[in-house]
């Protein structure tokens, strides 16, 4: 018997956000959003989960997954990421010049 792959099954909420995906091998993902349409929680059929927090401008400032891995971001007044760090100890700082070009510090 032949199997034909016709694409994933995707469901959307009333705002057009993807809330469910199932691909041909049975892998599934579910997504939840806040009132600003930011993805605040995602989980999949393999038991992994991720939680996200955002600032008032919709920039992701914190992410944590079900394995305990975390990331933090800080932004300037223009929405540019100026500081990133993660729970593995990696950290980077950046600045942006008057042309908007990024430079590592």
Where are the regions a protein language model picked out?
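Alpha-helical scaffold segments
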Residues: 4-5
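A detector of tandem-repeat and repeat-rich interaction/domain scaffolds
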Residues: 8-105
């Amino acid at each position: 018997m032949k199997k034909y792959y016709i694409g994933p099954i995707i469901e959307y909420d009333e705002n057009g956000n993807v809330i469910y995906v199932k691909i041909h091998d049975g892998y599934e993902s579910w997504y939840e959003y806040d009132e600003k349409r930011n993805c605040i929680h995602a989980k999949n059929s393999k038991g992994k989960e991720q939680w996200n927090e955002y600032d008032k401008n919709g920039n992701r400032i914190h992410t944590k997954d079900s394995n305990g891995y975390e990331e933090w971001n800080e932004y300037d007044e223009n929405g540019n990421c100026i500081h990133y760090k993660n729970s593995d100890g990696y950290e980077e700082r950046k600045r942006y010049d008057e042309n908007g070009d990024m430079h590592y510090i």
